[in-house]
Amino acid sequence: MAHQAHAYHMVDPSPWPLTGAIAALLLTSGTAVWFHFHSLTLLTLGNILLLLTMYQWWRDIIREGTFQGHHTPPVQKGLRYGMILFITSEVFFFLGFFWAFYHASLAPTPELGGCWPPTGITTLDPFEVPLLNTAVLLASGVTVTWAHHSIMEGERKQTIQALTLTILLGFYFTFLQGMEYYEAPFTIADGVYGSTFFVATGFHGLHVIIGSTFLAVCLLRQVQYHFTSEHHFGFEAAAWYWHFVDVVWLFLYVSIYWWGS
């Protein structure tokens, strides 16, 4: 490798942007083919290629940052800005769902019976499973902070314990949400109430699964001695993401479950 007189990371040529783009093409065209011709072949191929691309691309980033030392302070600064902008884009993504919900609920049309929840909809009790879910996510926010402080203090064993607990709480939340969907007295086809409820809470549930996976990778890396008290941005990004998921749930709980019922 040629000597460089700057702290920035000159990335080696990589096939992953190309395979990622092909996966995106297969996913979008595969979805259209699935809707119109009921064939899952393209969609399945796209999913497999996307998962392989994600695994290998992130594996390469771990190699570059952890083993080759390319993630210097200026590079880490860029990664931080990237994560902040990504979370900001997610905030606006959820803002769209809240907008749809409040647009429908603050001025219910005559078709809904002029009231909210619409006539004929039996809502979920916000003080049963949704309240338990809130407690579970808030507890996971505490355990992920405990993990962060343990990493910074070099407490390896405590970090592993706290991360394991956070992941278990994340999976417990997903299980409870799945049970709630199964027992719900309305479906996604029940007008604007059903669609806003299931799309908003469903996308949040998807983010919990993504966050749990992100933290599980961090746990694996922590077990393999990848993180030090100074160098652990992978974990920090996962913790930011988890706190974001936490805050979105609080807004969902107050808006859709409590006020909306």
From Swiss-Prot:
Residues 35-40, 106-128, 184-190, 257-261 are mitochondrial intermembrane. One of its GO terms (biological process) is mitochondrial electron transport, cytochrome c to oxygen. Its EC number is 7.1.1.9. The lineage of its organism: Eukaryota, Metazoa, Chordata, Craniata, Vertebrata. It catalyses: 4 Fe(II)-[cytochrome c] + O2 + 8 H(+)(in) = 4 Fe(III)-[cytochrome c] + 2 H2O + 4 H(+)(out). GO terms for cellular component: mitochondrial inner membrane; respiratory chain complex IV. SUPFAM superfamilies: Cytochrome c oxidase subunit III-like. Gene3D superfamilies: 1.10.287.70, Cytochrome c oxidase, subunit III, four-helix bundle. InterPro entries: Cyt_c/ubiquinol_Oxase_su3, Cyt_c_oxase_su3_dom, Cyt_c_oxidase-like_su3, Cyt_c_oxidase_su3-like_sf, Cyt_c_oxidase_su3_a-hlx. Its main location: mitochondrion. It comes from Oncorhynchus clarkii (Cutthroat trout). Residues 1-15, 67-72, 153-155, 224-232 are mitochondrial matrix. This is Cytochrome c oxidase subunit 3.
